[in-house]
């Protein structure tokens, strides 16, 4: 097996550091940190790069620590526990901003990027919002082994690894893992969510319910909901600190209405677009339970309560509807990891919407879509990075775009 001594450079999105081999080829080394000298073995060759494995650390980064989790190197969940928490913040911010810089620099012929996005101070202007580094994750999908044990997906494998503890899980889920309870059906999967006290699964609860920023939000245990509740609340509070809502609001990829729910007191009209009919039904219920309780202040405005419209369709088909011709002063867009649908992005760029709040779980697709928005005349006024997923390379981005 080929071995070489290399010095790592920067960390790239995915949490591997890059280094150069003797022949000039780039090698990606997982579990390494920047500026370490390593003896590595080459484990996989590609046309333009290689993958390496650490055999020995010859010069150790001052930021390297022992992983807290005993399953770290086999579990497919975390990949940054080798760095201290503060340095992780720096690494995640660096990786996210590099993805943005790289995507925008591909459009060098468009001077708009130099003016709006590639200024030297952009790194300092981007706001990093942190929360708990451990005991934060409230949602898991576990595999049930043949003996009834809870397992998580094994790293780079179709297999699974039995989990006796998970230090990033909220205490209620950690206690469940430590109890070694084996009451679940072998050779199956189970979705588990905790509000910090209760454990919700598809077996013991039809609905999950949490309270965020004073609102009650219900969703299905099998459906999507954010896994870091404290950071979700910080995200919501930040959005509505900057939102200037006076008329019509569009909630794109709305899910259960998490963001538009908080626009109720200011908007005259709210449109939710979501392809998942089950999630949209929960959105309707969330507006109902909050408007009929103290969750939403129902002081009658001059123009009455806002009208709420639910559109069960995907982003690709939104532009074909008559409602897409309406003028919205605010759009919330929270797409899946693949980013905004091409057709939806085209509509958004030409919509004339005054302010767009783009929430993204992937800095790469956020950067790609940002390029299109900037070309169409929007300015990236604020850029936030919310540390939703400590101990991993993942991060949540909020971009606030405005057009005069």
Curated annotation (Swiss-Prot):
It comes from the Bacteria. GO terms for molecular function: 4 iron, 4 sulfur cluster binding; metal ion binding; rRNA (uridine-C5-)-methyltransferase activity. The active site is at 361 (nucleophile). GO terms for biological process: rRNA base methylation. [4Fe-4S] cluster binds at residues 69, 75, 78, 166. Keywords: 4Fe-4S, Iron, Iron-sulfur, Metal-binding, Methyltransferase, S-adenosyl-L-methionine, Transferase. Its EC number is 2.1.1.-. Belongs to the class I-like SAM-binding methyltransferase superfamily. RNA M5U methyltransferase family. This is Uncharacterized RNA methyltransferase TDE_2619. It comes from Treponema denticola (strain ATCC 35405 / DSM 14222 / CIP 103919 / JCM 8153 / KCTC 15104).
């Amino acid at each position: 097996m080929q071995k070489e001594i290399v010095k790592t450079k920067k960390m790239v999105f995915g949490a591997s550091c890059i280094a150069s081999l003797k022949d000039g080829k780039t090698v990606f080394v997982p579990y390494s940190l920047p500026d370490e000298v390593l003896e590595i073995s080459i484990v996989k060759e590609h046309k333009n790069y290689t993958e390496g494995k650490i055999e020995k650390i010859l010069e150790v980064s001052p930021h390297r620590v022992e992983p807290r989790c005993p399953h770290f190197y086999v579990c497919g969940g975390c990949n940054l526990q080798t760095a201290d928490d503060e340095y992780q913040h720096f690494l995640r911010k660096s990786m996210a901003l590099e993805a943005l810089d790289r995507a925008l620099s591909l459009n060098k012929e468009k001077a708009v990027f130099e003016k709006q996005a590639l200024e030297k101070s952009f790194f300092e202007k981007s706001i990093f919002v942190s929360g708990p580094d451990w005991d934060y994750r409230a949602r898991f999908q576990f595999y049930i082994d043949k003996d009834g044990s809870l397992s998580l997906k094994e790293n780079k494998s179709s297999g699974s690894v039995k989990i006796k503890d998970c230090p990033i899980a909220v205490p209620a889920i950690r206690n469940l893992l430590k109890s070694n309870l084996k009451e679940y059906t072998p050779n199956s999967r189970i979705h588990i969510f905790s509000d910090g006290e209760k454990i919700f699964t598809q077996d013991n609860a039809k609905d999950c319910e949490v309270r965020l920023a004073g609102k009650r939000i219900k969703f299905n245990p099998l459906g999507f909901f954010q896994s870091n509740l404290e950071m979700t609340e910080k995200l919501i509070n930040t959005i509505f600190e900057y939102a200037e809502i006076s008329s019509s609001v569009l909630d794109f990829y709305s899910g259960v209405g998490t963001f538009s729910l908080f626009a109720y007191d200011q908007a005259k009209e709210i449109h939710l677009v979501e392809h998942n009919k089950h999630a949209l039904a929960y959105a309707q219920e969330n507006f109902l339970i909050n408007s009929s309780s103290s969750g939403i202040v129902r002081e009658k405005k001059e123009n009455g309560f806002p009208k709420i419209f639910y559109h069960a369709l995907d982003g690709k088909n939104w532009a074909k509807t008559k409602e897409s011709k309406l003028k919205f002063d605010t759009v919330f867009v929270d797409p899946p990891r693949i980013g905004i649908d091409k057709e939806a992005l085209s509509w958004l760029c030409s919509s004339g919407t005054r302010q767009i709040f783009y929430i993204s779980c992937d800095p790469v697709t956020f950067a790609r879509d940002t390029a299109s928005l900037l070309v169409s005349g929007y300015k990236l006024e604020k850029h936030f990075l919310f540390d939703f997923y400590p101990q991993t390379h993942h991060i949540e981005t909020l971009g606030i775009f405005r057009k005069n």
